[in-house]
């Protein structure tokens, strides 16, 4: 079995054993793009001036993680999404580590994983792009709510459904609209530039 270039694959060697073949250029490209998306996740929240209320409305960290999942695939999206809020909290003190950065780590990891996995499984059309994007956005918010509920239980506090609804949907409406408008436009541009499939 021959390996297709551009991504790690399981290949059948002589004797029936399997091995993994990796294209060094593809790995380097993925690392560079992952670092770029991670840097954007650090920088974009600065446009809100570290004002939590504005950040909650615009959700600036969501953009590079969703893009990372689409461009690089689910595993990269998961890794960059999980790392970004935790490292940013350590470096800049924002978002606060507990419970916000921790819950965001799981939320963004879900965004990156689901968007990447779905995009690899569907036809690369604009309707399927929207379907993958919306599914990832819903999955990430559900994961965020579940983690916040667990963390609240660990500290003896409460996280009612009204708090979930406010944080996941009502407060974030401007960011949700911006994601639905801008991310497909960016992805189509990246497709035309041959940066992604």
Residues covered by each model-derived region:
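Membrane-embedded alpha-helical hairpins and interfacial helices in multi-pass inner-membrane proteins
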Residues: 50-55, 93-102, 121-197
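Hydrophobic transmembrane alpha-helices
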Residues: 15-71, 75-76, 111-120, 183, 187
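Alpha-helical transmembrane segments of multi-pass membrane proteins
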Residues: 62, 66, 105-112, 176, ...
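Interfacial aromatic-anchored transmembrane helix boundaries in multi-pass membrane proteins
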Residues: 43-59, 83-118, 152-154
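Hydrophobic alpha-helical transmembrane segments
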Residues: 31-36, 63, 67, 78-82, ...
